[in-house]
Swiss-Prot record:
Native organism taxonomy: Bacteria, Pseudomonadati, Pseudomonadota, Gammaproteobacteria, Enterobacterales
Quaternary structure (record): Monomer. Can also form homodimers and oligomers.
UniProt-listed PROSITE patterns: HD
GO biological process per UniProt: RNA repair; tRNA 3'-terminal CCA addition
Family: Belongs to the tRNA nucleotidyltransferase/poly(A) polymerase family. Bacterial CCA-adding enzyme type 1 subfamily.
GO MF, any single term: magnesium ion binding
Reaction(s) the record says it catalyses: a tRNA precursor + 2 CTP + ATP = a tRNA with a 3' CCA end + 3 diphosphate; a tRNA with a 3' CCA end + 2 CTP + ATP = a tRNA with a 3' CCACCA end + 3 diphosphate
Name the UniProt record assigns to this protein: Multifunctional CCA protein
Amino acid sequence: MKIYLVGGAVRDSLLGLPVTEKDWVVVGATPEDLLAQGYQQVGKDFPVFLHPVSHDEYALARTERKSGKGYTGFVCHAAPDVTLEQDLLRRDLTINAIARTEQGDLIDPYHGRRDLENHVLRHVSDAFSEDPLRVLRVARFAARFAHLGFQIAEETMALMQKMAHEGELAYLTPERVWKETEKALGTSSPDVYFQVLRDCGALAVLFPEIDNLYGVPAPAKWHPEIDTGIHTMMTVAMAARLSPEIDVRFATLCHDLGKGLTPPELWPRHHGHGPAGVKLVEALCQRLRVPNPIRDLAKLVAEYHDLIHTVQVLQPKTLLKLFDAIDVWRKPQRLEQLALTSEADARGRAGFEDTPYPQGDYLREAFRVASQVSSAGVVADGFKGIDVRNELTRRRTQALADWKAQQPDASATS
């Protein structure tokens, strides 16, 4: 029985990146051998075991044969005679098909180390096309390693395009699509993930609402990049600079979906695109089973991001209505999330990347002023029932009016 460290742990250590989890392959053993040593079997479809002390995953060397559609249609063969090279051959990318012995020696039959050094994402074999999930995985790795200069090999991109064209992606479950997308949103370059999906034809299949934005023009005065799809990718890249939160990045991705509904004869203007986009956000999130908190923020951002751009000229009553609409009294974190998504929208434009966004600080300060007026103070003054809310609104409106009167003339700068 021989044990090898494989996959991401080897890859990341060679790249000088932190290793967060370790996966091992066991060659020349049976399930009974591992169970006798105290390992716990956890894989139903695959022979995967947990180490009795470290709880790392140990998998028996295996081969896989395509038996149906999608990423679950495989027959797995695990036996003591399966070699390490056979096990590595079934993996997606050469950079993930490197093994390390217990003595520290590298085993690299498919030249993954060379591709690491050349910053290339390349499939190991044509068996890559048997698993449609790998299209998303490659897009995610492209996003994760974009800052290191990694590019997808031409032959790998051609294979991904073929898979998208032949309809294999239709067999992916919503949960798997969202899981890969969520991981990609957490990388330093989430926009690259969606760009790769578009380049291979997968975006139109999995995210048609986003794909529809390409070719939709916006006024050149406000959007020098003109194309709404390009603007969306620029805003996602900006959101990644501004916030590590998946919620903020996903909401930014969805903020302009309504522009895809504008009739061409009305281009390049998109009046009312915010509220119009809410239904598209809802549909996308339901289809991919996006968690409710992420969905709810995305819907609010779609509806209110344009209003936040004009926050400096809003009347106190309108400001309070905005705070009520986003439920910021019970969920104060939403204020910062909306401020950041709106800033990403404003700065995610050609030539505006380093432009200040004073609306964000104005929104934060307005909320601070309004929240200093508490319902406890109103109750202490003897108000009861519905009168508490009415008086609270009146006092907050007055507080905002007094504060607003002390601000510089916003119309001159907005």
